[in-house]
Amino acid sequence: MRVKHAVVLLMLFSPLTWAGNMTFQFRNPNFGGNPNNGSFLLNSAQAQNSYKDPAYDNDFGIETPSALDNFTQAIQSQILGGLLTNINTGKPGRMVTNDFIIDIANRDGQLQLNVTDRKTGRTSTIEVSGLQTQSTDF
């Protein structure tokens, strides 16, 4: 009887002891394993990297204008504003800069700007309708 019980017990426990394929997974991502650990490894490497490329320019190619450039632009804006104010009284105007020649005129209630590029000689005409002949104060 004992032998029968032992055989039955062995038959019951034998499915639990069937062998399967062994699979190994790395627990430490520094030694490989899951490809999802790539961002972790890249961040770790970048945190340890102290090399600075001497040719690297961090300003993205944007040049900040100098104080003289800002002043020149402000003066040109003031002069152009004055010309646009005088156009209401019927006085045409001209502004000459290093790059452009701007002619402003009132043609039958239309503001007409002729802009000539001094480097290429190309001319653009801008016409704005609805010009008021009398200025209003706000």
Swiss-Prot record:
Pfam families: CsgF. InterPro entries: T8SS_CsgF (IPR018893). This is Curli production assembly/transport component CsgF. The keyword Signal applies. The gene is csgF. May be involved in the biogenesis of curli organelles. Residues 1-19 form the signal peptide. Keywords: Signal.
